[in-house]
């Protein structure tokens, strides 16, 4: 009598990022090599609550996915899975319903691809007995427990390319160009892109800034014969003594335009503001992100084969390892104000708006 085919599930949750499809592809191809069946769950964790919200994924379904942005499974960062208010097990509890759905589908593992919010939900499901394995995703690179998340490198490439393009127009018109990039709570994109693109000022959430110091940097460049400036600001950056800025409830944004308006008043120079926004999320993943996503997907299946649950695959140095999901939850991977990268930037004359 033939044994029942092993089955695993995979879902994508939270904001989209380049490399999601590459992870899905690696999961399907690796599982297929073991003779396993893969169930793709639509619309993140919400798909565990619906009917007919999943489908079998075959090698044919993932053909050509490696360079494709977005996610064929769709995703959502809203829904029923908020923080659990009670340890009581109720049939109305979405977490309880999700665990039941996992059991009914006969999944030996559920691979959850996402950032801190996704892994927090996965951890709660694991506490209720679900065999979950996390895969770290966020363009902000702010997920704890791993040295690098996929999606970051592609976003960095987009931001750096934007700085390169802004340099030519800024120099041609003697303008100050302000580029607002993503980074709700951390400044990894702004810092890396600012260094790679040769910015003059970098403003990040970890280093509150004085707009007067930023203006002084712009005017100092003028006096030195450089009549244009490039300023890169993370969306979560904030002035010293101030708070983050929002363009709508729960949506960070507006800091770039605020910086631009203040600099026009303080320097009398012409300022233009560019907000990259979702351009950083879309499009084909970079070669590095394709490789990292592929390694993560394959490692997640290997973890399932070894019966390792309640863990997240992660990059440590050059190796892919597994770490407890709890390591990815509760705190963020932030830029250290005295890190080598920040010190490097300062040594090059890049200002952070906190100078004395």
UniProtKB/Swiss-Prot annotation:
Site residues, Important for substrate specificity: 117
UniProt-annotated catalytic positions: 140 (proton acceptor)
Function: Catalyzes the phosphorylation of D-fructose 6-phosphate to fructose 1,6-bisphosphate by ATP, the first committing step of glycolysis.
Keywords linked to the UniProt accession: ATP-binding, Cytoplasm, Glycolysis, Kinase, Magnesium, Metal-binding, Nucleotide-binding, Transferase
Binding residues for substrate: 138-140, 175, 182-184, 235, 272, 278-281
InterPro entries in the cross-refs: ATP_PFK, ATP_PFK_prok-type, Phosphofructokinase_CS, Phosphofructokinase_dom, Phosphofructokinase_III, PKF_sf
Binding residues for ATP: 15, 78-79, 115-118
Cysteines paired by S-S bonds: none
UniProt keyword Metal-binding present: yes
GO BP of this protein: canonical glycolysis; fructose 1,6-bisphosphate metabolic process; fructose 6-phosphate metabolic process
Top EC category: transferase
Localization terms from the record: Cytoplasm
GO cellular component terms, semicolon-separated: 6-phosphofructokinase complex
Pfam families hit by this protein: PFK (PF00365)
Residue ranges crossing the lipid bilayer per the database entry: none
Residues at which Mg(2+) binds: 116
GO molecular function: 6-phosphofructokinase activity; AMP binding; ATP binding; diphosphate-fructose-6-phosphate 1-phosphotransferase activity; fructose-6-phosphate binding; identical protein binding; metal ion binding; monosaccharide binding
The species this protein was found in: Chloroflexus aurantiacus (strain ATCC 29364 / DSM 637 / Y-400-fl)
Cofactor(s) needed by this chain: Mg(2+)
Protein name: ATP-dependent 6-phosphofructokinase
């Amino acid at each position: 009598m033939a044994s029942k085919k092993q089955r695993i599930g995979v879902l994508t949750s939270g904001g989209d990022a380049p490399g999601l499809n590459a992870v899905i592809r690696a999961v399907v191809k690796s599982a297929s090599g073991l003779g396993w069946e893969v169930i793709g769950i639509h619309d993140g964790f919400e798909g565990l609550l619906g009917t007919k919200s999943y489908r079998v994924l075959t090698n044919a379904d993932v053909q050509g996915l490696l360079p494709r942005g977005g996610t064929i499974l769709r995703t959502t960062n809203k829904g029923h899975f908020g923080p659990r208010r009670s340890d009581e097990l109720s049939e109305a509890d979405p977490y309880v319903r999700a665990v039941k759905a996992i059991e009914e589908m006969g999944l030996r593992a559920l691979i959850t691809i996402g950032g801190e919010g996704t892994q927090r939900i996965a951890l709660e499901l694991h506490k209720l007995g679900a065999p979950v394995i996390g895969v770290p995703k966020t363009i902000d690179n702010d997920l704890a427990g791993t040295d690098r998340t996929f999606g970051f490198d592609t976003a960095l490439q987009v931001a750096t390319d934007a700085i390169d393009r802004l340099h030519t127009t800024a120099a041609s018109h003697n303008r100050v160009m302000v580029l607002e990039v993503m980074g709700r709570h951390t400044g990894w994109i702004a810092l890396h892109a600012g260094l790679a693109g040769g910015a003059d000022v970098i403003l990040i959430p970890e280093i509150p800034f004085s707009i007067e110091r930023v203006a002084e940097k712009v005017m100092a460049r003028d006096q030195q014969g450089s009549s244009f400036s490039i300023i890169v600001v993370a969306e979560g950056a904030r002035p010293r003594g101030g708070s983050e800025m929002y363009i709508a409830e729960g949506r960070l944004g507006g800091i770039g335009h605020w910086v631009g308006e203040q600099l026009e008043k303080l320097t009398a120079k012409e300022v233009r503001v560019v907000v990259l926004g979702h351009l950083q999320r879309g499009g084909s993943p970079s070669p590095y992100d394709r490789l990292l996503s592929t390694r993560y997907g394959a490692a997640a299946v290997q973890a399932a084969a070894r019966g390792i649950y309640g863990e997240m695959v992660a990059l440590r140095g050059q190796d892919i390892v597994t770490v407890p999901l709890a390591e990815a939850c509760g705190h963020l991977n932030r830029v250290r104000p005295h890190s080598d990268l920040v010190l490097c930037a300062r040594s090059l004359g890049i200002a952070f708006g906190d100078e004395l």
